[in-house]
Amino acid sequence: MTKQTEYKRKPEWLKIKLNTNENYTGLKKMMRSKNLHTVCEEAKCPNIHECWAVRKTATFMILGAVCTRACRFCAVKTGLPTELDLQEPERVADSVVQMGLKHVVITAVARDDLKDGGAAVFAETVRAVRRKNPFTSIEVLPSDMGGVEENLKMLMDAKPDILNHNIETVRRLSNRVRARAKYDRSLEFLRRAKEMQPDIPTKSSIMVGLGETREDLIEAMDDLRANNVDILTLGQYLQPSKKHLPVLKYYPPAEFAELKEIALSKGFSHCEAGPLVRSSYHADEQVRSAKEKTAEAK
């Protein structure tokens, strides 16, 4: 039995209860009516039913639904992106009002076809949400925007409450998992964000189950802390289709608990770790925890 077939069957702890109550169906209709996209749907997130039906939260995906990159773990469509929709920021802001969100996550496809990587629309979306929802905390989850400092500055000047950028995997596997992104470029992106706005918490996420070792994960944690990242999320990689990378290991909940303890011992202010954890999972709790610890440190 090979590693690839050994883990083909999902373990019990990955089975989730589907809840499609009126909150879920209502949010889905609203997204379609406003021509908005969510990473919850596009990336086939396993928590969509909990977030939409129970917590009534969602992660908006701006700049279209087509990504210029083709990372081997991701279910988002790739190809030639659509034209920029300059009305999108206002529609996102209106949706946040309609949903009554206390915390919103704004992410985007990679737009390597744009000189600014989509930074201007990203920043305007933050400002639009802030104008119409002054008490809503805002988390942004951008691509590396080509590693261009001016693009990052444009986004950070909009003053989101938290900057999230995912390294996705460990250094050893990075080129295979996300060939058009660079591990060290992502670390530099996170470091520069903290240098530009020291009071804004930074965050990153790692998927497990792609062939990494415990030592690889500890190295990645150390790399993130060396670049002043505050929050870490750890979750199980799930293969979106047979065309994507296979799952080489399903981590049990107990192992996630061990990894969380290691992460906290490294100095992360908050770590969310579990089989179904994704970057935006319980994001409102993460930002609250990080801000409380930042205040305590002053």
From Swiss-Prot:
Where does the protein end up?
Cytoplasm
Record: residues binding [4Fe-4S] cluster 2: C67, C71, C74
Recorded E.C. number(s)?
A: 2.8.1.8
- Signal peptide per UniProt: none
> Which keywords label this protein?
4Fe-4S, Cytoplasm, Iron, Iron-sulfur, Metal-binding, S-adenosyl-L-methionine, Transferase
Q: In which pathway does it act?
A: Protein modification; protein lipoylation via endogenous pathway; protein N(6)-(lipoyl)lysine from octanoyl-[acyl-carrier-protein]
Q: What's the record's note on cofactor binding?
A: Binds 2 [4Fe-4S] clusters per subunit. One cluster is coordinated with 3 cysteines and an exchangeable S-adenosyl-L-methionine.
PROSITE patterns attached here?
Answer: RADICAL_SAM (PS51918)
Obligatory cofactor(s):
[4Fe-4S] cluster
Q: Reaction catalysed by this chain? A: [[Fe-S] cluster scaffold protein carrying a second [4Fe-4S](2+) cluster] + N(6)-octanoyl-L-lysyl-[protein] + 2 oxidized [2Fe-2S]-[ferredoxin] + 2 S-adenosyl-L-methionine + 4 H(+) = [[Fe-S] cluster scaffold protein] + N(6)-[(R)-dihydrolipoyl]-L-lysyl-[protein] + 4 Fe(3+) + 2 hydrogen sulfide + 2 5'-deoxyadenosine + 2 L-methionine + 2 reduced [2Fe-2S]-[ferredoxin]
Indicate where this protein is primarily found.
cytoplasm
**Family annotation (SMART domains):** Elp3
Q: Name one GO cellular component term.
A: cytoplasm
Q: Which Pfam family name is an example for this entry?
A: LIAS_N
> Could you say which residues bind [4Fe-4S] cluster 1 here?
C40, C45, C51, S280
Q: Mind listing the GO molecular function terms for this protein?
A: 4 iron, 4 sulfur cluster binding; lipoate synthase activity; metal ion binding
Location of the Radical SAM core domain: 53-269
**Homology family:** Belongs to the radical SAM superfamily. Lipoyl synthase family.
Q: Which HAMAP family match?
A: Lipoyl_synth
Name the record gives this protein: Lipoyl synthase
Q: Which organism is it from?
A: Bacillus anthracis
